[in-house]
Amino acid sequence: MARVKRGNIARKRRNKILNLAKGFRGGNKNLFRTANQRVMKALCNAYRDRRRRKRDFRRLWISRINASARINGTNYSKLINGMKNSEIIINRKMLAQLALNDPKCFEKIVSSVSN
């Protein structure tokens, strides 16, 4: 039976991991075993944080809306409840951008909701 040499396959596998480890510090970019561990950890963190990013941005938007709503004499929960009751359909991202970039428009929304 012919001898099977796995040089190319093993080298490709290692180079794939080492390429993913570019930019890491110390032996984490050069040594295969530590690079492999760091890459696996990085991929796990990236997977987790892609989901977490959505939560973090929603929290940020809510904080911004609440701060601007309090400046205009109401709070977040009353504002959102009033918007639902008066059938104003603006999502939290757009509302936060309005509060940040166009306070006059946000103030009009708050006044129309509170009436």
Swiss-Prot record:
GO terms for cellular component: ribonucleoprotein complex; ribosome. SUPFAM superfamilies: Ribosomal protein L20 (SSF74731). GO terms for biological process: ribosomal large subunit assembly; translation. Coiled coil: none annotated. One of its GO terms (molecular function) is structural constituent of ribosome. InterPro entries: Ribosomal_bL20, RIBOSOMAL_L20_CS, Ribosomal_protein_bL20_C. Keywords: Ribonucleoprotein, Ribosomal protein, RNA-binding, rRNA-binding. Binds directly to 23S ribosomal RNA and is necessary for the in vitro assembly process of the 50S ribosomal subunit. It is not involved in the protein synthesizing functions of that subunit. Belongs to the bacterial ribosomal protein bL20 family. HAMAP family: Ribosomal_bL20. This is Large ribosomal subunit protein bL20.
